[in-house]
Amino acid sequence: MNRAKLYQLVLFPMNNGATNVYYILTLNFIAYYANGVLGLLLMFATTMVTVMRLFDAVTDPIIGALIDRTSTKFGKFRPFMVLGNVIMIVSSICLYFGTRLISGEMSWLRYVCFVLFYALYVIGYTFQTACTRSGQTCLTNDPKQRPLFTIFNTVASLIGMGLVQFLAPILSKRLGGYNSAEFFNVMIPLAIVVSAILTLLAVVGIWEKDRPEYFGVSKTQEKVKVKEYLAILKANKELQRLMIAGAGCKLAFSIATNMTVLCMLYGAMMENYDGLYLPMMIVGYVFSVPFFLLTVRTSQKHGQKASLVRYTAIALVMYIGVLVLLVLWKQGNPAWNLSLGPVNLYTVLFVIFFGVGYGAYYSTADMPIPMVADCSDYETFRSGRYIPGIMGTLFSLVDKLVSSLGSTVVGAAVAMIGIHTLPDGNTLYSDGMHGVVIVLFCIVPMIAWIMTLIAMKGYSLTGSRMKEIQAVNAVRKDAINRGMSLEDAMQTWKEMDQVPEKFRQS
């Protein structure tokens, strides 16, 4: 049994926090920069977020194959983590500062450089994010430890992503808004430093485990070509179901937490963005704490599938209440608006439904990531191949293809109601915003959660099943280390009842 030390479980997920710093910046603010600072067209700015997310998805399988083929003195995953972060640093400086040096009279060059630097950033981002999903396979294969990876992964995300979300409105208010160059002059260097520190911690976390003895069951790893991806995906039904579940969760998150949507909800509709955004964000995080503890306990006792299904269902039920409250909202009527002083019944109900719903959802938002490791171990059990890079990037391929729609959907929805500049905290209410917020903030996440529940219905990698898979993989690896061929080991041990007692988990 390959078990991780506590510090490794805590530090390696910081890799996800490091990339989420850039992810949330891109998701929420790059369109503001392109439109407000560079003067690029609104639809171009929002559409480019989708186009580059698609490019990110396309590069995933290629980089996944590179990871699986890589074996250096510095390990398999660490080179991609470090190089990816360096590329993002360079590209961010060029993207957010270099493009401003181009004269407004040469707007065509601004468009070209924006696209090129953005594409370079995507390559670096893919290098590093691919390691979060694939690297965990060598960190631990203990079904009781992998749920802990979820909670530490979420904490790491909060450190990176939460820091940006917390500081952004404060800096925006002091530096002229999200459309100002001054805002990016402070936010980008801060993001670079935070991401670099988190990357360093993640490298320390995986240092001892990034070695060949923790890679799969065979001493030699088969090189899989990119063209074989489709066959692998077709054969691995569990990964297919997880893709649907993960993509649905990511789409819900990318749209419902989009800064434009929140500006319309708390600013234009409730007329108090500065007084509501941070408190409501904190409410969601506070409510998520008990759910984190519950998800870990449920995952350790019944498996990660049971935890994901249970708490996604709770989020779905609670958001029915949020939906009803937003439908009942009345402009200018204090009794039907959010207010933290004085507090009304509408606010109390909203905090309860939103807090419990968001808390339940957020506690499971990153759960598909360690579940990818389960699918990777299942692939090793099924075919004998240790291909965590391919498995992780196959998952993120669909994940990114779907979530890439987020900014475009928001941008298109805003354009449909006649708004030509992305709303910020000071934007006044206009006709159509009410319906747009209801759809983007409530209905889209609810549909995504229903997709998740349907996909998980046929998912077979339960807690007990993963114990069987790990036991079979362990006895095969032991036999191969003693001289047996991979083919013979695959044929000799197929089921739990064939496994010697010493390889079985308690």
What are the language-model segments listed below?
Residues 1-505:
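Membrane-embedded alpha-helical bundles of multi-pass transporters/translocases
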